Amino acid sequence: MTTQPRKILVTCALPYANGAIHLGHMLEHIQADIWVRFQRMRGNKIHFVCADDAHGTPIMLNADKLGITPEELIAKAKADHIRDFAGFNISFDNYHSTHSEENKQLTAEIYNKLKANGFIKSKVISQLFDPEKNMFLPDRFVKGTCPKCKAEDQYGDNCEVCASTYSPMDLINPRSAVSGTTPIVKESEHFFFDLPAFEGMLKEWTRSGSLQSEIANKMQEWFESGLQQWDISRDAPYFGFEIPGAKDKFFYVWLDAPIGYMASFKNLCNREGIDFNEFWAEGSDAELYHFIGKDIVYFHSLFWPAMLEGSGYRKPTNVFAHGYVTVDGAKMSKSRGTFIQASTYLNHIDPECLRYYYAAKLNDRIEDLDFNLDDFVQRVNTDIVNKLVNLASRNAGFIAKRFESKLADKLEDESLFAEFTAQAEQIAAYYESREYNKAIREIMALTDKANKYIDEKAPWVIAKEEGKEAELQAVCSMGIELFRVLMSYLKPVLPKLAERAEAFLQAELRWDNIHQPLLGHTLAPFKALFSRLEKKQIDAVVEETKALFAAANKAAEKTEAKPTALSAVEPIAETITIDDFAKLDMRVAKVLKCEAVPESNKLLRFELDLGDHTRQVFSGIKAAYNKPEELEGRFVIMVANLAPRKMKFGVSEGMILSAGTGGSDLFLLSADNGVTAGMQVK
């Protein structure tokens, strides 16, 4: 019985058209590309699309700063992004832009359907307005003093120091981050998407069993906190699409951005005669998968499926989220030269090296991946050069010189060949489930067996003995056959190396012919397949990255007033009485669990043991601790009698104490050995 090919549409999250592609982006695009290439090898009908996310206030302001139009800015960004993705052999069928006619039409259509179905509400809201720039200010473009802890220079939506969330109008001494002027309050009518109306559907979708467990668990927390109506409009001036029938109102970038998936596919359909509705219509039997980072799970697991449901389109089959990239155990850093742009990497290192390294560490869970530079060099050279490519080179010479490049007519060890090909379905299952680390581990175990076989047979010894020509040909042919099987398994990960291997083998590497040996087959002359990775190449990438950002900082200093340096020590606050201090109940707490809040750039969620009970506390120290799980088991100091605060992501039942100026410059306070959970700090 022949199985019908699956119909699959795959997307990656849309890179923002206001910056360069870096190695953090590449994790997702390599992960998706490996999966797509595997599906193609399996004979499935698959389309792979992406686009630039090209709207929003930051793009409008950056273009103005550069003295160009937003259209010019996003055109250059798109060209740069396409170049970088091509450099890493990302095999998109289409790469488009959200600033397109297809996206404009689809966004208007979906909005009108949502409105007709009663899912769009309107209400007048008060916002901060920059009178100098004549524009309403998004939360992130307002700064001031936190109304809760009085920390200065905080954003308009939440405090990095105490993790409080608030309205921009609650800020003390607010100022526009665009012009520096003091904003005024103005009213404006805004449009809202009625997300709570879809809670039942979203809960059912969550329980379907297809979502990653981490996403399903996080969605349950959001349900418990209560879904809120979503503001989908922005006031002029704004770079984006105008809302039909609403003068000077524009769609918020996060409304039209995911519709960009549909628009990019629509563009491909129009060009190649593909049936758009076959993949997007309600009830479609096609599969739809979104590969995304953990920071945008909120939009893709709540707003996006609800928008599709409300406008009569199908929902995603699944959303595959991944973690962040760290370098040498720390957050990517511009000053240390580890915030590596894709173009900088490509100037010095083969992209296949990174594809392999990421694949060797990627799994199906939402975990951060550490790009360890020393381990990178060692793993690439050990696995690809010393083991895999060496298997071909150490046998190809004998076949070429002694047998006119012709392989033997039969297998020297049929049972060993069968052992290798028997792993095809298990390795396929690992690729299918995105457990690439397990696939690589299995493939490398086979590679070790292949090299052990050659070591034991020692063709270099056989070659010196008369009358053993047939044995020499059989052994070396067996080595080449095993290399062919291994390269077939690695083709989704190393497409360019696979191309060179196919040229040498003069045979296509396909999943459906893995079991068919190249008996009596003639090889092409062997050429070097892969070069060793040298430490000096890594050093060159790091140094170029440092120089790149040093030059950018120097240019910024010429165009912007240098900010006043922070004093070495913050001034002492106003005097309080002993009675004031006595009101604080500070306790030692043990961290039972600590995790990042995916939809927040600042917050970590702590589960704390206070001796006789546990509490949940949110703390805005995410930038300082990019491996929150390492805080588990540690003792911290907290204010235990602070009134609970209901936040967007749950209730925070206290405040964890830390020292520093904010951002990555924060350090948790701890106690000496011997303390126990619940002890009072005196």
Swiss-Prot record:
* Gene Ontology MF, one: methionine-tRNA ligase activity
Q: How is the cofactor bound?
A: Binds 1 zinc ion per subunit.
Q: Which reaction does it catalyse?
A: tRNA(Met) + L-methionine + ATP = L-methionyl-tRNA(Met) + AMP + diphosphate
Q: Top enzyme class of this protein?
A: ligase
HAMAP family for this protein: Met_tRNA_synth_type1
Record's family? Belongs to the class-I aminoacyl-tRNA synthetase family. MetG type 1 subfamily.
What is this protein's function?
A: Is required not only for elongation of protein synthesis but also for the initiation of all mRNA translation through initiator tRNA(fMet) aminoacylation.
The name on file for this protein is Methionine--tRNA ligase
State the organism of origin.
Haemophilus influenzae (strain PittGG)
